[in-house]
Amino acid sequence: EGFGGLRGITGEPDRMPSRVGISIGDSLAATYGCMGILAALHHRNQTGEGQIIDVALYESVLQVMESYVADYSASGFMRTRTGAILPKIAPSNVYPCKDGEFLIGGNQDPIFKRLCDAMERPKLAQDPRYATHLARGENQAELDDIIAEWTRTLTVAELEALLLAHAVPSGKVYDAEDMLADPHYAARESVVTLDDPDLGPVTMQNTFPKFSATPGSIRKHAPRTVGEDTTDILERWLGRPA
């Protein structure tokens, strides 16, 4: 993450670089490795030839760094840590509520007007400091303070219902407890429950993406001991005696 640049742009600007929160380099490398395998299989099917797939952790991180390198190469602009905001794009931030945090993306002019209506402050959208996309970007911190003062008076549920009614892109910042309680997660089977021999029922994320004809599934828990699945693989998958 550090070598690939991600750690350097993650966190608050006045603090040391922060971890993303998960071991994302490992997951990205596995994802690009899988993509490489699929592309190599397609090549093999066309040509009959195999090839070596070289996947580096840092290059997998580098691949998702958007225009980070190109920005610096072309103009000398070095992207830095900005915390939760998008610099000069406002409002687009996480705001405090009575009982949690809420993400609001109201930076486009029509959306910002609807946000002001939801706040019952329609004149705010006509204020020269906030009336245009560029003006809001120049007064980002001040505008965030105004919105945060308003969101603090509401619960997450109240704010969610209000902004949904005004068609303002927004959403609650979820944790695992929220995910397990959300009917959308259940309806799409985004999480599934498996019986673990040691832990009992364990709920976890399902397999993604979803396929209409050949849906994937989590069939069993991870092996507890080395070689636990050897017999099954040899006999059932390879047709060889264990």
What are the roles of these predicted feature ranges?
Residues 164-185:
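Conserved PLP cofactor-binding pocket of PLP-dependent enzymes
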Residues 90-166, 170:
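Aromatic-enriched alpha-helical interface/lid elements that frame and gate functional surfaces
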Residues 33-40, 68, 114-118, 146, ...:
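Alpha-helical scaffold segments in soluble metabolic enzymes
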Residues 198-242:
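Flexible, small-/acidic-enriched active-site or ligand-binding loops
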Residues 72-79, 182-196:
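Short, surface-exposed loop/helix-turn segments at secondary-structure junctions
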Residues 1-102, 106-107:
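Active-site-adjacent "lid/gating" segments in soluble enzymes
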